[in-house]
Amino acid sequence: MHHTSMGIKMESQIQVFVFVFLWLSGVDGDIVMTQFAGVDGDIVMTQSHKFMSTSVGDRVSITCKASQDVSTTVAWYQQKPGQSPKLLIYSASYRYTGVPDRFTGSGSGTDFTFTISSVQAEDLAVYYCQQHYSTPPTFGGGTKLEIKR
């Protein structure tokens, strides 16, 4: 199933998928959103780093590579300690409602980048990329952003 038209409908589908995944996990927070790899043909999403350390005010970028062309059907999520994941970016570069403009996304095809232009203390979290070009949607392994004091 390939998605070519993006918008509100896709945002809702992404959120529904995450909520269903959380519900099936039987946990409220601190889940590990791993790749749904293992089935032949599943798209593997590989994030550049498992950990990144930065300081308040710095610019930081996280990259994500898809194992095949996924057009611009990539979302980015933020999961703070003890909380459920929140959608930040959908369709590679569109900020979800209420997301601060310091968060941006870019890319298409196989290479994607998520950037925080000026890191704030509250940005301490794990960030995940996800493709929804094909079923099942698959996640990157996550990048934990640590803030230097």
From Swiss-Prot:
Residues 91-97 are annotated as: Complementarity-determining-2. Residues 130-138 are annotated as: Complementarity-determining-3. Sequence repeats lie at residues 26-35, 38-47. Residues 76-90 are annotated as: Framework-2. This is Immunoglobulin kappa chain variable 6-17. Residues 42-64 are annotated as: Framework-1. Transmembrane segments: none annotated. Residues 139-148 are annotated as: Framework-4. Residues 65-75 are annotated as: Complementarity-determining-1. Residues 98-129 are annotated as: Framework-3.
